[in-house]
Amino acid sequence: MSKQVPLEIESVTNIQNLRNFLARYEKEVFCCIELPAVHSAYWFANRGQFKELLSLDAKLTASPALQCFSEESLYVGRQHLRMLKPMYDQRMLQRFRKCVINGEAKGWNPIVFGVFLSIHSVPIREGLLQFGRQTWSGFINGIKDKKGFLESECLELLDHYVDRLPRWIENVVVESNTSPGTLKANFR
């Protein structure tokens, strides 16, 4: 059995490569790691489960499937954390930020996003939909600008993935209802 080629956005040179990349990303990272991680972070933040939040951060850090996306995810997560500065009176956020500054946590985007949803009392389905839209839009529009892909082809791809979000979100939420409070992400 041959080993799977690493998932790298840099290898995308045409629209078909982009389709293939997005299909793999959806299957290997987005649906089984990122969406469940946002949901778990939301759950942990709602319940004040700080140790579990740090454990989730460590598991994301150790996940080989996320390594090629770590720079971007950490950058976005830390930027989001900085934008939440006016909310540092929130104990969970304050503690997590301190751990990121001290190097005890990395500050992955799905975790910061989940905490953000919890602090702002955003309903989880709505929040996961927002996370998904931002993720797909970031990938597709970012590569479109870099590679000069046609707007119409990229818009079609974006619509395709955004239209699929409700099903994936429902899978995450329904699965979590069967065993509340447990980590849902399938780390690889």
Where are these regions (language model features)?
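Short secondary-structure junctions and interdomain/linker hinges
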Residues: 29-33, 45, 67, 87, ...
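C-terminal auxiliary extensions adjacent to catalytic cores
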Residues: 131-188
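Electropositive phosphate-/nucleotide-binding environments in soluble metabolic enzymes
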Residues: 12, 16, 32, 67-70, ...
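Inter-helical turn/loop segments and adjacent helix faces that build the functional surface
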Residues: 8-16, 87, 91-95, 119-127, ...
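Hydrophobic alpha-helix position signal
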Residues: 2-8, 84, 117, 143-144
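Internal, conserved structured core segments that host functional sites
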Residues: 35-43, 47-120
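Glycine/small-residue-rich interface belts in oligomeric ring/scaffold proteins
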Residues: 1-50
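A contiguous pocket-lining binding segment that forms or flanks enzyme active sites
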Residues: 98-150
